[in-house]
């Protein structure tokens, strides 16, 4: 199973150079519009130095580093608190000329951000790791919160309160936390307005729109370029991206071009 997952991740990334979404938008453009990052935990290298060499060999632009496992731990299993690993990760990224596009708190896929009393400490740990690796975006999935929270006033109020607090923490350090929800684009826009923090934006995930039968490009347009900090280019319909009939990458690229969006696109779940 691991061999198949690894093989298909390699295949997708090798194809990345000729994939339209990854191209520089316009021959006269000096700055690369779309940069490609790979999530380290999805190539079985969560907080492992080897992720940099692999992404370099595949001509990627950066790595989305995870904070480490969470589970029932009080804090993330995070190596980036230790000076030795801080230096090692920085030097390795520099060696391979790779950016750390974002720092991910993927532990919140399984653990509820709403139920963690020490949520500020966990986010502060991430903000510190971002400073260490010079990353400007954090990834915070809300998947661990029990479904339906957005329709229960007391739960929604608490989620908004917590996101406002950590968003302001991020903004004070000049960085952004990108949240992933199961809401549609209009729902995300409403949530962002309620949070009202410059430190919270949307980390848009293709899979959520596609699995819920939403028009992916319309969702992107509704959100607009200023509300999307980064994108997870992923789907789980059973095929690799070049053969995915419900994900039209040419159309997605044209949509992002028209929106004027510039940023990093991270690959996560890539399956055969």
Show where each model-derived region lies.
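Active-site acidic/histidine proton-transfer and metal-coordination neighborhood
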Residues: 92-99, 109-202, 210-211
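Conserved small/polar residues in nucleotide/adenosyl-binding loops
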Residues: 268-272
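Hydrophobic faces of well-ordered beta-strands that scaffold small-molecule active sites
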Residues: 34-39, 63-65, 100-105, 138-140, ...
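Acidic/histidine-rich catalytic cores of soluble enzymes
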Residues: 34, 52, 63, 160-253
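Acidic (Asp/Glu)-rich catalytic clusters
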Residues: 31, 52-57, 80-101, 125-134, ...
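Glycine-rich, proline-tolerant flexible connector loops at the mouths of alpha/beta enzymes
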Residues: 66-88, 145-147
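N-terminal export leaders
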Residues: 1-7
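Catalytic domains of carbohydrate-active enzymes, especially glycoside hydrolases
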Residues: 51-68
């Amino acid at each position: 199973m691991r061999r198949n997952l690894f093989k298909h991740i390699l295949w997708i990334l090798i194809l990345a150079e000729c994939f339209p979404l990854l191209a520089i938008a316009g021959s006269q453009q000096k700055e690369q519009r779309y940069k490609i990052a790979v999530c380290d935990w999805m190539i079985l290298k969560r907080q492992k130095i080897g992720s940099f060499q692999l992404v370099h060999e595949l001509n990627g632009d950066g790595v989305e580093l995870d904070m480490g496992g969470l589970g029932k731990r009080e804090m993330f299993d995070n190596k980036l608190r230790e000076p030795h690993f801080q230096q090692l990760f920085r030097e390795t990224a520099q060696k391979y000329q790779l950016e750390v596009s974002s720092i991910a708190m993927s532990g919140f896929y399984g653990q509820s951000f709403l139920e963690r009393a020490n949520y500020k400490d966990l986010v502060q740990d991430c903000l510190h790791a971002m400073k260490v690796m010079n990353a400007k975006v954090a990834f915070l999935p809300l998947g661990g919160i029990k479904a339906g929270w957005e329709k229960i006033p007391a739960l929604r109020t608490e989620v908004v309160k917590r996101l406002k607090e950590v968003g302001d923490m991020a903004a004070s350090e000049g960085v952004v936390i990108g949240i992933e929800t199961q809401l549609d684009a209009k729902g995300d826009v409403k949530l962002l307005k309620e949070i009202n923090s410059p430190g919270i934006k949307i980390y848009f995930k293709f899979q959520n729109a596609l699995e819920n039968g939403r028009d992916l490009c319309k969702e992107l347009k509704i959100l607009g370029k200023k509300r999307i900090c980064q994108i997870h280019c992923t789907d789980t319909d059973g095929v690799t991206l070049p053969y995915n009939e419900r994900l039209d990458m040419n159309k997605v690229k044209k949509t992002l071009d028209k929106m004027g969006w510039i940023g990093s696109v991270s690959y996560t779940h890539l399956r055969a």
